[in-house]
């Protein structure tokens, strides 16, 4: 039997790193439309875009998406997601996948994977994905979030800093990654149960989440387990910087 889940795509116009990001044109379409189209190719029963901006609302309606306006004062995309699921009236055990609005090349198969990951791990409140890192530049890039998991696949922590810090190896040479250390980049897509989202919002942000600007740290701070799997197909590139945008444009306009 196929898994029933809903995809929500948070889309904010006021991105701090790349203003106007969801509406930036790529191959004749706004970026958020590419994300929506990829999500529609997954096994999701419903795909909803959540925004706090009228221009995004109008653009999404123009290409036929289901889109909801939310409050503008949310601390994170997950807080925005909680408002959406409350509006949709989903039951507490329903699975919702949060697909970031800056992943226009997100493979539909990994949207299905993260939903199945959560369904297979009832001990976890959240499921997410990662991919191996092989380049030192990525380890030291603050836009590439690193994740370290325990032997059971549960996240120990996430950070924009190089994690783990290879003390002896990096003291000698930071241009080579030490052998035997499984560096992993977090892929910013999550599956939640609706009941967890209600708890998440009630907690409010913690100092660690605010320091790193990583909303998943709020869950770890409160003792919630996050199960992490390596993606069976990794996205080519997310869009965090103007350079990322140009790379994606070259790929989709080729």
UniProtKB/Swiss-Prot annotation:
Write down any Gene Ontology CC term. cytosol
Among Gene3D superfamilies, the record links this protein to: Spore Coat Polysaccharide Biosynthesis Protein SpsA, Chain A
**GO MF:** 3-deoxy-manno-octulosonate cytidylyltransferase activity
CDD domains to which the protein is assigned, alphabetical: CMP-KDO-Synthetase
Indicate the transmembrane segments per the record.
none
**Main localisation:** cytoplasm
Q: What InterPro entries has UniProt attached to this entry?
A: Cytidylyl_trans (IPR003329), KdsB (IPR004528), Nucleotide-diphossugar_trans (IPR029044)
Gene Ontology BP annotations: CMP-keto-3-deoxy-D-manno-octulosonic acid biosynthetic process; lipopolysaccharide biosynthetic process
Reaction catalyzed: 3-deoxy-alpha-D-manno-oct-2-ulosonate + CTP = CMP-3-deoxy-beta-D-manno-octulosonate + diphosphate
Q: Copy the pathway line from the protein's UniProt record.
A: Nucleotide-sugar biosynthesis; CMP-3-deoxy-D-manno-octulosonate biosynthesis; CMP-3-deoxy-D-manno-octulosonate from 3-deoxy-D-manno-octulosonate and CTP: step 1/1; Bacterial outer membrane biogenesis; lipopolysaccharide biosynthesis
Residues annotated as signal peptide: none
Keyword annotations of the record: Cytoplasm, Lipopolysaccharide biosynthesis, Nucleotidyltransferase, Transferase
Matching entries from Pfam families are given as: CTP_transf_3 (PF02348)
- Could you tell me the EC number(s) of this protein? 2.7.7.38
> What subcellular locations does the record give?
Cytoplasm
Protein family: Belongs to the KdsB family.
* General function of this protein: Activates KDO (a required 8-carbon sugar) for incorporation into bacterial lipopolysaccharide in Gram-negative bacteria.
Checking HAMAP family in the record gives: KdsB
- Output this protein's name: 3-deoxy-manno-octulosonate cytidylyltransferase
């Amino acid at each position: 039997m196929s898994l029933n889940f809903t995809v929500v795509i948070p889309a904010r116009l006021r991105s701090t790193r790349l203003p106007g990001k969801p509406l930036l044109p790529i191959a004749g379409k706004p970026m958020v439309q590419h994300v929506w189209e990829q999500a529609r190719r997954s096994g999701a029963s419903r795909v909803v875009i959540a925004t706090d901006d009228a221009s995004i609302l109008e653009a999404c309606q123009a290409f036929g998406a289901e889109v909801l306006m939310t409050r503008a004062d949310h601390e994170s995309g997950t807080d925005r997601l909680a408002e959406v699921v409350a509006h949709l009236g989903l039951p507490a055990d329903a699975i919702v996948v949060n697909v970031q609005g800056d992943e226009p090349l997100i493979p539909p198969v990994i949207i299905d994977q993260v939903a199945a990951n959560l369904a297979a791990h009832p001990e976890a409140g959240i499921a997410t994905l990662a991919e191996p890192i092989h380049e030192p530049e990525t380890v030291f890039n603050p836009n590439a979030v690193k994740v370290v998991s325990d032997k059971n696949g549960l996240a120990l922590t996430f950070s924009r800093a190089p994690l783990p810090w290879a003390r002896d190896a990096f003291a000698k040479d930071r241009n080579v990654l030490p052998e035997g250390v499984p560096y992993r980049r977090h892929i910013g897509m999550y599956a939640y149960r609706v009941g967890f989202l209600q708890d998440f919002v009630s907690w409010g942000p913690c100092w660690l989440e605010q320091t790193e600007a990583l909303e998943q740290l709020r869950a770890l701070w409160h003792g919630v387990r996050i199960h992490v799997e390596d993606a069976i197909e990794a996205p080519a590139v997310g869009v965090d910087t103007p350079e990322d945008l140009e790379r994606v444009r070259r790929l989709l306009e080729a």
